[in-house]
Amino acid sequence: MKINAMSLFSSAGIGELDLHKGNLNFVVANELLKKRADTYQFFYPETKMFQGDISDEKLKREILLSAQQNNVKFLLATPPCQGLSSVGKNKHQDHFIKDNRNFLIFEVFEFIDVLNLDFILIENVPRFIEMYFPYNGQLLLLEEILKIKYASKYQIDIVILNAKDYGICQSRPRAIIKMYKYGITWKLPTIQAEISLQRAIGHLPPLEPGEVSSIKWHSAPNVKPSIIEAIRHTKPGTSAISNPIFYPKKDNGERIKGFHNTYKRMEWDKPAPARTTYSGSISSHNNIHPGRLQLDGTYSDPRVLSLLETFIVSSIDENIEFPPGSSETYIRTIIGEAIPPKLLSAICFPDGENINVK
């Protein structure tokens, strides 16, 4: 049986790529940014997209009306990670608290309050569930607020799940909040063995920076020669920052300083580190291909993962298409913003079973 669903703070819809294949029928979506909303529509032309600020009362009423007319029973939301990291005396804290626009999770509450939903899924970065939000004159954790508001109607499960435990070659922890009516069964997915980078992308041919291969999406951005030299002398799992001789340099020859995980290669026997919105930057955290030892003692592939490799470790179909004009930077950004599709699918459809109200 099809269940009508809606997606709030949908971004470009990357996380939903496997959801629309199940029995969830996404009829309504909302995204603030036009380019991302247009990309969502490219992927899901049958879903009605309401582009704009969800805190705008007129737009919110339109979204709610559409959801009611379509008898939406499933809500997916990824609100921005906004809140207070601690409860203390901060001269800016009172001003921050008084502006509800700083707490967009409250917009999600309005939809839960109005719609007779069977399932609610809120996902975000792990620190989201450690933040404090103003509620009834107090600063409370999200779990505390949810239990006050909804424990009488919904079972509330809050967990941290890591993509690497669910058949995805990427260590990507996410905070998962599931709310579902009492009497409904919605179990957690079964943990699977980790997938190494060797198994996931080891079959792909090496690439030099700036090289465009004949394989779709398998090309490498260019890199400054001095950086290439430093990375060639960097072993898997280590950072070029700590190399004694061949290290990243500025144009004037001065040594570049950075954290231990910048200019760092991945490791073949582990899943990829989390793919962020900066996955195309060779200097950003844990972004460099593991490389293979060469006869001269250096290592191949002094580059970031290609888009194809990024798709693979993010559980995205290798033959995916994007709207015309989508730049590599944009594609990497929207992937970095999203939960890996296979993880979201595993949560919604545990063990491959359709979600059901029985």
From Swiss-Prot:
GO terms for biological process: DNA restriction-modification system; methylation; negative regulation of gene expression via chromosomal CpG island methylation. It is an enzyme of class 2 (transferase). Keywords: DNA-binding, Methyltransferase, Restriction system, S-adenosyl-L-methionine, Transferase. InterPro entries: C5-Methyltransferase (IPR050390), C5_DNA_meth_AS (IPR018117), C5_MeTfrase (IPR001525), SAM-dependent_MTases_sf (IPR029063). The HgaI modification system consists of two cytosine methylase genes responsible for modification of different strands in the target DNA. Belongs to the class I-like SAM-binding methyltransferase superfamily. C5-methyltransferase family. This is Type II methyltransferase M2.HgaI. It comes from Avibacterium volantium.
